[in-house]
Regions:
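Accessory alpha-helical/coil subdomains and C-terminal extensions
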Residues: 171-190
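Short, ordered loop/turn segments at secondary-structure junctions
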Residues: 30-31, 89-90, 125-129
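Short, acidic/small-residue loops that bind anionic groups at enzyme active sites
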Residues: 99-126, 135, 144
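Generic secondary-structure signature for well-ordered alpha-helical cores
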Residues: 3-6, 33, 48-53, 73-80, ...
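Glycine-rich phosphate/diphosphate-binding loop of Rossmann-like nucleotide-binding domains
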Residues: 14-62
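A charged, well-structured terminal subsegment
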Residues: 142-177
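N-terminal amphipathic/basic leader segments beginning at the initiator methionine
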Residues: 1-20
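Glycine-rich phosphate-binding loop
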Residues: 67-109, 113
Length: 190
């Protein structure tokens, strides 16, 4: 397990961009709620710790992890958010259902990231047993929800910076076109 040597809740606050003006959506699966509530608490507390006001954090619940895709899609379409975190927990059982749900959710969230301009952060535990999930939702390995919140802040910042850069480049392009037009007019008037 990749988290054995890492505490998911640890981060250097000095490396986190200012998040006080960002708005975040969190879509939480009700399935395995003892785990998903722990993940949500970790995410919420990390956002608050990084100066995101509570009223700028929107929470929606969905029945299970597979429904996270639709919930995130609708949040992206209807809420003015800078990033969305999807929180779920799928634990290996004795059937292939685990594989189908994990693959479907992973692909669905990946598709949202490709199709939209707002980052969707994947915080879905896919563990072999309940103890592994407990350990990663506030247990001995920290809280994956905290890690997801920090990723959401960083990705919202990247989105913001890309938008600023794009706007600046558009400004330069328009300015350049206007300068060319002015030069052409001067030449024509000579």
């Amino acid at each position: 397990m990749a988290t054995e040597n890492k505490n998911l809740s640890e981060y250097d606050k000095n490396t986190i961009p200012n998040a006080k003006d960002f708005r975040f959506g969190i879509v939480v699966s009700e399935w395995n709620d003892a785990i998903t509530e722990g993940l949500y608490n970790g995410a919420f507390e990390a956002l608050i710790d990084n100066e995101v006001p509570a009223q700028q954090i929107i929470r929606w619940n969905v029945p299970g992890s597979f429904e996270l895709i639709y919930g995130a899609k609708k949040m992206l379409q209807t809420q003015n958010v800078d990033a969305v975190i999807v929180i779920g927990c799928v634990i290996q059982g004795q059937t292939k259902h685990f594989d189908f749900v994990c693959e479907g959710v992973t692909q669905g969230i990946k598709d949202l990231n490709v199709q939209t301009d707002i980052p969707v952060i994947f915080c879905v535990l896919t563990d072999n047993n309940m103890q592994q999930s407990i350990d990663r939702s506030g247990g001995i390995h920290g809280n994956k929800g905290t890690e997801a919140a920090i990723a959401a802040i960083k990705m919202a910042y990247i989105r913001q910076q890309a938008s600023i850069s794009h706007s600046y480049n558009q400004h330069l392009l328009v300015s350049g076109v206007l300068q060319i037009e002015d030069t052409i007019k001067k030449i024509e008037n000579e």
